[in-house]
Amino acid sequence: MSGIVGIVGDVYELEYRLADMLRSLRHRGDCGSGFWVSSFVESRIGMAHCGRMVSETEEDVRQPYVDEEEQVVVAVDGDIYNYAELREELQAHYTFVTDSSVEVLSKAYRQWGEGCFARINGVFAIALYDRREDVLLMARDRYGVKPFYYTTSKGNLYFGSEIKSLFGAGLNRRISIERWAAYMLYGTYGPSYSTFWESVSQLPAGALMRYNGYSLSESNWYDIKEEIERLVSLHDETALRTMLEQELRTCVSRCMSDVSVCGFRIGRRAELQILHNIAQHGCQSGKMRTFADTTEDVVEQSDVLPIWVAPSHVVEELQRMKSWAEEPFDGCETIVRTRLFRQARRQGMKVVCSGVGLDVLWQDVWDNSGRNCSYLYPHKLFSPLLALYAAKPAYGSDFVNEDDRNRYCELSQERLPHILRVYDRSSAEAGVSVRLPFLGGHLVALSFALPLVSRQNRKEFVAHYMPPSRKSIEPVEKEPLYPQWMSQSLKEWIAYNIEALSMGEVRELFDVKQLRRMSNNFCNNKPVDMALLWKCLSLQCQLGDE
């Protein structure tokens, strides 16, 4: 877990602004911080980095890393899974002075140029300054596991690992009415480059951005559709199955190979599949700790650490979300996940693993998830003005198969990018690093490619890799947590925030009477649309923190 920030341009007191930006990311790492400032074209460039050392095998090197011999400056947030293999390949051409992945990145760039990113297996957000060419490169991993945000103001470029770091530089903080309106009406999180904040963009997954001091240009160094076509054209079913099995084994080693203890959440199919793969391929005894979300009335199992979620925790976590969420949150699931991260940290863990990515392999998470661009809720809560701001999401269809098209949209545009952003910020706030080993390589592309050359459908061939007992990996039905959490303090918190929304700067977007009626119904234990209530609370949390 790391945080990177940067400024390029003619900025007054650049060093102080850079320090303020980094200070806003101090929760992402407390193992020291590094600053680097230099001239750039006709202005200046500055980068800073803070981090939390997770790996127990890799050398800790202060960043931004300055490679004087290659004239490259690098700052990275992420994990390079194959850095040892890349280092071995590069040793014939370069002399290494550290045993760190960041130096490998520097040498890899000098050897292969922009083509180096395609050789990397891992999750990363990278800022790399080529001093010979006077160009700044910014790159993001294949599926956008690691975040990267940027904005321009008065001809200057600002970038960072979280949106709050941009505001830390003194830039204006304003929500995007258009983006929030589209979320309220259509449930869309927006295109891959957009955010819920005015004038703030994110670098899309698999993208590479260049800045030469005068203009920004962007291209894709990775395209999943191109990789699927390449896999299908070059390999038959037997070869693809072998590649899939190898990728699953590799993913297991990414979980725990460089840490002494690692946490896993159980209760969902993807996480349980991780444990099955670990048992199948072996792991060091004592490395693994498992969690299960529960409430205070559940007896602790001997081999599972319960995640206590008491009514008092709910309000506490909701209050904290105001400072870290930066976009809509998902109610119960976000609260439980954040409590897991916090408890893992108290247990002394640096790393918690998730099975995100395996969902794509099974497909069930994305079954029937295509967006029909219609109102998702009765819109009597909203004023006609909201519909004028909201734009219907529209995505291209390059897949012949409709299921693949829907999966691709959720993978690259909607659900998965949102989940990854929430994972990143909530884990950073809690002080742990989340590993998503199934999104660092080629597993997702293989899950698309194999059905194209096989007589079996996706679920049929995936059954081969499931635990012997199918029942052991089925999601467990649980009673809703709302009745257990329905404390007076939670009702008061919700009533206060809905009232603030009805009186605030965006009240004209709502029918205020309907908004207050929803709040009253909730507090009086009457049925309400909880998803819609969470949307309104998410919006107010961001407004209330302005």
What kind of feature is each model-predicted range?
Residues M349-V365:
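Short acidic/histidine-rich active-site segments
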Residues T295-R346, W362-Y375, A449-V453:
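ATP-dependent adenylate-handling ligase core
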Residues M1-E326, R337, L537:
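Cysteine-centered catalytic environments shared across enzyme families
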Residues S101-V102, N121-V123, I177, E333-T338, ...:
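Conserved glycosyltransferase catalytic-site signature
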Residues W36-V37, Y149-T152, W362, V444-L450:
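Short hydrophobic alpha-helical segments that form membrane-spanning helices or hydrophobic packing faces
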Residues L240-L244, L248, C332-V336, R407, ...:
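Soluble or luminal CAZymes and related metallo-dependent hydrolases
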Residues M1-I4, D20-R23, G115, G168-L171, ...:
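Adenosyl-5′-phosphate
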